[in-house]
């Protein structure tokens, strides 16, 4: 009934099952703006802190490099991206008060004409922006926020597909 080093077989089996488990990633929508793949920085060197879940506490997090950007909406119109509520991901609060299950579900809330495409025909299209955090400090400034039209982005297909990619 005891396995390795006197540990019960059940505990040993559970340990072996979970030792390589990693939680599923629930990243917000990020755009590859220079066609070289989405590049990220880990929490090892430069520490970026950001309030993902809108609890008022900025915590260390992985982040995108400044040549890529987060899709954002300044929901409180204060000129900055304050928390994950203003990104499009699992921390986005939907109109029914529930959190989105992913960034595409969050963005789909803005598909005002229901055609599964987010574009100029949708009421909020002109308000959605891309945040390129040039100084990698997790605090948005006016010069880091770009309109979709400034970047030549005309639409998003809201029919999400799943693809697992190791970003390093």
Segments the model singles out, each with a brief description of its role:
Residues 3-168:
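Calcium-binding acidic motifs and repeat modules
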């Amino acid at each position: 009934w005891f396995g390795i080093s006197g540990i019960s077989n059940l505990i040993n089996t559970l340990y072996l099952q979970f030792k390589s488990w990693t939680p599923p990633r629930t990243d917000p929508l990020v755009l590859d703006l220079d066609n070289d793949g989405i590049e990220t920085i880990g929490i090892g060197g430069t520490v970026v802190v950001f309030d993902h879940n809108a609890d008022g506490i900025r915590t260390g997090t992985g982040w995108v490099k400044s040549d890529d950007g987060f899709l954002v909406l300044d929901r409180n119109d204060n000129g900055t991206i304050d928390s994950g509520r203003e990104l499009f991901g699992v921390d986005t609060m939907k109109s029914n008060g529930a959190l989105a299950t992913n960034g595409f579900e969050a963005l789909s809330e803005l598909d005002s004409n229901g055609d599964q495409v987010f574009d100029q025909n949708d009421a909020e299209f002109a308000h959605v922006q891309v945040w390129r955090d040039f100084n990698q400090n997790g605090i948005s400034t006016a010069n880091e926020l770009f309109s979709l039209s400034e970047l030549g982005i005309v639409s998003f297909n809201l029919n999400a597909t799943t693809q697992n990619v190791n970003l390093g």
